[in-house]
């Protein structure tokens, strides 16, 4: 079973997170940051994974530590659940439209961490969520999953639509990458490991 559960406690956050790559339920997100909960729920639905997150953070400061640390723990959990990555497609790409916005995510579960992020947000806040944290989350996710991740807004105006498009596109690209392909024997690399 491709699943993992991680508990991580620091002086800034206390996080319990569980993933199952081969089940779609349950999805239950509680971070104390409403917009972020919404984005993580969309990410889970579009990647078709089970994801539960219970996070308590120093929200009296702001939501930066909570969002970044959830990205760290989610990346670690996904990496653990993938194991040796035998049989997976490894690569995934998705374009997701949302009204006037078109977002793209392309990723490689290569074991090499890198983020390319091309998105601007006109609105600095969505609820109590700072839009600059979209990049912080994906940076933490990419580096801890050890994934090469390219994100881009091709066009759009509405900040909510832009963020939502990127979370959905990343979820859909991840589903493609983690899917086991019966035509792939071992790992999808000439090196013999990922």
Curated annotation (Swiss-Prot):
Keyword Transport: no
InterPro entries tied to this protein: IGPD_sf, ImidazoleglycerolP_deHydtase, ImidazoleglycerP_deHydtase_CS, Ribosomal_Su5_D2-typ_SF
Record has Cell wall biogenesis/degradation as a keyword: no
EC number of this enzyme: 4.2.1.19
Primary localization: cytoplasm
A Pfam family of this chain: IGPD
Subcellular location: Cytoplasm
Enzyme class: lyase
GO terms of molecular function: imidazoleglycerol-phosphate dehydratase activity
Gene Ontology cellular component terms for the protein in this record: cytoplasm
Gene3D superfamilies: Imidazole glycerol phosphate dehydratase, domain 1
One of the GO biological process terms: L-histidine biosynthetic process
This protein's pathway: Amino-acid biosynthesis; L-histidine biosynthesis; L-histidine from 5-phospho-alpha-D-ribose 1-diphosphate: step 6/9
Entries under SUPFAM superfamilies matching the protein: Ribosomal protein S5 domain 2-like
Catalytic activity: D-erythro-1-(imidazol-4-yl)glycerol 3-phosphate = 3-(imidazol-4-yl)-2-oxopropyl phosphate + H2O
Keywords for the protein's UniProt record, in alphabetical order: Amino-acid biosynthesis, Cytoplasm, Histidine biosynthesis, Lyase
CDD domains per record: IGPD
Similarity annotation: Belongs to the imidazoleglycerol-phosphate dehydratase family.
NCBIfam families (UniProt xref): PRK00951.1-2, PRK00951.2-1, PRK00951.2-4
Protein name in the entry: Imidazoleglycerol-phosphate dehydratase
Species assigned in the record: Streptococcus gordonii (strain Challis / ATCC 35105 / BCRC 15272 / CH1 / DL1 / V288)
